[in-house]
Amino acid sequence: MAKEGLGLEITELRLGLPDAEHQVSVVNKKNEKKRAFSEIDDGVGDENSSSGGGDRKMETNKSQVVGWPPVCSYRKKNSMNEGASKMYVKVSMDGAPFLRKIDLGLHKGYSDLALALDKLFGCYGMVEALKNADNSEHVPIYEDKDGDWMLVGDVPWEMFMESCKRLRIMKKSDAKGFGLQPKGSLKGFIESAAK
């Protein structure tokens, strides 16, 4: 700054953005056109204002400021509003290398769920597994809120929807080692849903 006449201003190290002196004058010109908050009105018919009606632009009110609220809390808030309509649970099947999600709220009973699982994994036999567990090679089980694994169909549908955290379709031989014995108890649920 002592050597202003030598042309070394370009290579001089200083705090701030490069060419900040030039930008300060540009920023000041932009700020001259801005109005203070107290000068802003609600846009209610002020035709005799000093700036004139034609120069003023109507500002659109945004419902949210960009970047606020944080994305996580925004998604959480929106998911709470839609919580009753969407009840996704993860579904895994023994032998399948992937997991799927299914919306329990779309299904009216165990028979609809069994048909959806048949379509989802491309294996046919879930309806038979729910009707007569002795003749099928797969057994559908679910994990409830307490972390206990139970057979699908042991409880009424509404209670199942409230307590189900995830579904698993096991091979019947593994289910016996797991401590679950298929009882064929869904026969009444399937027959009542079919009527």
UniProtKB/Swiss-Prot annotation:
Statement: the UniProt record of this protein carries the keyword Transcription regulation: yes
Quaternary data: Homodimers and heterodimers.
Occurrences of domain PB1 (ranges): 86-174
Primary location recorded for the protein, binned into one broad class: nucleus
Induction: By auxin.
Organism from which the protein derives: Glycine max (Soybean)
Entry domain remark: The N-terminal half of the protein contains two conserved domains I and II. Domain I includes a slightly degenerated ERF-associated amphiphilic repression (EAR) motif which seems to be involved in the activity of transcriptional repression. Domain II is required for the correct degradation of the protein through the SCF-mediated ubiquitin-proteasome pathway. Interactions between Aux/IAA proteins and auxin response factors (ARFs) occur through their C-terminal dimerization domains III and IV.
Family classification: Belongs to the Aux/IAA family.
GO biological process, alphabetically ordered: auxin-activated signaling pathway; regulation of DNA-templated transcription
Function, as annotated: Aux/IAA proteins are short-lived transcriptional factors that function as repressors of early auxin response genes at low auxin concentrations. Repression is thought to result from the interaction with auxin response factors (ARFs), proteins that bind to the auxin-responsive promoter element (AuxRE). Formation of heterodimers with ARF proteins may alter their ability to modulate early auxin response genes expression.
Disordered, as annotated region: 37-60
Motif (EAR-like (transcriptional repression)): 13-17
GO cellular component term, pick one: nucleus
InterPro entries referenced in this protein's UniProt entry, alphabetically: AUX/IAA_dom, AUX_IAA, PB1-like
Designated name of the protein: Auxin-induced protein AUX22
